[in-house]
Amino acid sequence: MSGDAAALWPRVAEGLRRDLGARTFDHWLKPVRFADYCALSGVVTLETASRFSANWINERFGDRLELAWRQQLPAVRSVSVRGGVAATERAATLASVPLPTFDAPAAPAANPALLGFDPRLSFDRFVVARSNILAANAARRMAMVERPQFNPLYLCSGTGQGKTHLLQAIAQDYAAAHPTATIILMSAEKFMLEFVGAMRGGDMMAFKARLRAADLLLLDDLQFVIGKNSTQEELLHTIDDLMTAGKRLVVTADRPPAMLDGVEARLLSRLSGGLVADIEAPEDDLRERIIRQRLAAMPMVEVPDDVIAWLVKHFTRNIRELEGALNKLLAYAALTGARIDLMLAEDRLAENVRSARPRITIDEIQRAVCAHYRLDRSDMSSKRRVRAVARPRQVAMYLAKELTPRSYPEIGRRFGGRDHSTVIHAVRTVEALRVADSELDAEIAAIRRSLNS
């Protein structure tokens, strides 16, 4: 019966194109493919490559899809569109395995989606610039080199900067280069839940065996194990066993290992033993190139240069925020037939701009601190260690971390090329002093008020 329904999809699509118009249909529904029809439930399942597209199609065209299908097949009760990796769940039946372990097939040219990976998150689609070149190059080496000189690889950045993209890219390239390898890609939260479930279910041996069978373990968002002592202990043993066996480990987190308060020292030592690569906030050039790369894959969509420049100017904190704004603009234009221009962007993305507006810059913080303590601006970058200069400099570093999205290495560079560990020390020192020294706490509060005024 599924085959009969599949044969109807071209007719359904033709009717939708006629009803919705060629432009809207071609942009949203042309990439959709028939997946399945269950005669028992009356549910038609369609597939598209993007979760974003799937969500929009379900929300905006769900009723139209059901009506179009019922005109061809009256038994249809509902239509569902799924996107991303869900589109290949038929070929990668992983539900029976508690941990998402992916065994690459023998064919070197296997489709990454069939392994449970998102083929869009590849190295080819990761735009490289100064802010992320260390992390990108290290990730490529981890995926391809027979014996990487650094292991584990620790990627850290704020949210939406591309850490998960690099994890997926590593997994896909490693699977292509090592067809018989076992790859595990999971979040630290998933590791914790699986560990707790194995303990309660008396299945620890199977849990340990699955993890230790990995040739490549990729662990996302390590900060989720902060304060989870038993999970950290098991993770430490897992890492030790993998490293001893010559296996590869890649970890991501939202901060450097030294700032993971609540994580056991031995685990931090293991994670710091390879390479710690920071991804900084994206510069203007990188943000523009990301937009143009996205648009190059959509030749039917026209976005003027002044709109691209406006997006680059107003969405500076992270890539996810930028792509979200672009998606919203493209979706509105596709669904309403509106022409994309600067006026439309300013109107439809006004709320996004308000939430994305950069709070304060490091330059502004340095100026405010120097004004408060009557220092010269050069003191922020100087090597002078006298207390009258060193303490205000620490306060400025602390405020830079509190009030901007900049990473520790980036802040250090803005303070005379100081190492990220110096910035970490400054932040911790000022945090402690604010509790113990009410006068300093009041001074910092006054500086913050001046910055917000």
Curated annotation (Swiss-Prot):
Region (Domain IV, binds dsDNA): 334-453
Region called Domain II, residue ranges: 76-115
Keywords of this entry: ATP-binding, Cytoplasm, DNA replication, DNA-binding, Lipid-binding, Nucleotide-binding
UniProt-annotated stretches for the region Domain III, AAA+ region: 116-333
Predominant location: cytoplasm
Source taxon at top rank: Bacteria
Sequence similarity: Belongs to the DnaA family.
Quaternary structure (record): Oligomerizes as a right-handed, spiral filament on DNA at oriC.
Subcellular location: Cytoplasm
Xref: Gene3D superfamilies: 1.10.1750.10, 1.10.8.60, 3.30.300.180, P-loop containing nucleotide triphosphate hydrolases
Source species: Sphingopyxis alaskensis (strain DSM 13593 / LMG 18877 / RB2256) (Sphingomonas alaskensis)
Descriptive protein name: Chromosomal replication initiator protein DnaA
Cellular compartments per GO CC: cytoplasm; plasma membrane
Keyword Nuclease: no
Annotated spans, Domain I, interacts with DnaA modulators: 1-76
GO MF annotation terms: ATP binding; ATP hydrolysis activity; DNA replication origin binding; lipid binding
InterPro entries attached to this UniProt entry: AAA+_ATPase, Chromosome_initiator_DnaA, Chromosome_initiator_DnaA-like, Chromosome_initiator_DnaA_CS, DnaA_C, DnaA_dom, DnaA_N_dom, DnaA_N_sf
Gene: dnaA
Function: Plays an essential role in the initiation and regulation of chromosomal replication. ATP-DnaA binds to the origin of replication (oriC) to initiate formation of the DNA replication initiation complex once per cell cycle. Binds the DnaA box (a 9 base pair repeat at the origin) and separates the double-stranded (ds)DNA. Forms a right-handed helical filament on oriC DNA; dsDNA binds to the exterior of the filament while single-stranded (ss)DNA is stabiized in the filament's interior.
